[in-house]
Amino acid sequence: MKKAKIFLCSLFLLLPCSVKALESDVFPELVYWSAVRSGELNKIKSFLQNGYNPDKVDGSKLAPIFYAVKIGNPEMIRILMSHKAKVDIEDPSGNTPLILSARFPNLEVIDILLDFGADINHQNREGTTALMRAVEFGNFFVVRRLLDANPDLLLQDFGGRDVMMLSAQGRNKKIQNTIEKLYNKK
């Protein structure tokens, strides 16, 4: 009997084994966040369809929509929003995806966020709005697009600066002239 056990154990060890474990079976969280950070839409869709929370944050306390904004992926934003992601979710600094998007010249991303109801007047923990951020970064076309959403031009950050002050401190004369014209109308 002992020889039979040894034989069976030896046979088991010597025969090729075809057991496969997919990375997604062993480390689904890692696969999900890797897909989010690289914008792999099919993988993201699959995870969301299988119940993943579109607002779950990673170790950096960022929800997937922030990565979609950073990499400028409008389709990823649409996918997340179709799975009920929060358009005004905050990062640890109180920034929303719209405030983050104001740094980048991707008007399609901004349009999608606004279409899904992003709060144009949301202020982060420093009191900065998306318009203020766009002015600071000198993104004229982003500033124009955000102005079309009728932001409150009188809001101030917690340093007491409003959009007019920020535009005067900036180097972009087109932004400064545009903001001045709006203030003069009021």
Regions found by a protein language model. Give the residues of each.
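Ankyrin repeat structural motif
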Residues: 40-48, 73-81, 106-114, 139-147, ...
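Leucine-rich solenoid repeat scaffolds
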Residues: 153-185
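Intrinsically disordered, low-complexity regulatory segments in ankyrin-centric signaling systems
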Residues: 19-50, 59, 184-186
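Alpha-helical adaptor scaffolds
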Residues: 70, 91-111, 115-116
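Ankyrin repeat A-helix N-terminal signature
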Residues: 34-39, 67-73, 100-106, 133-139, ...
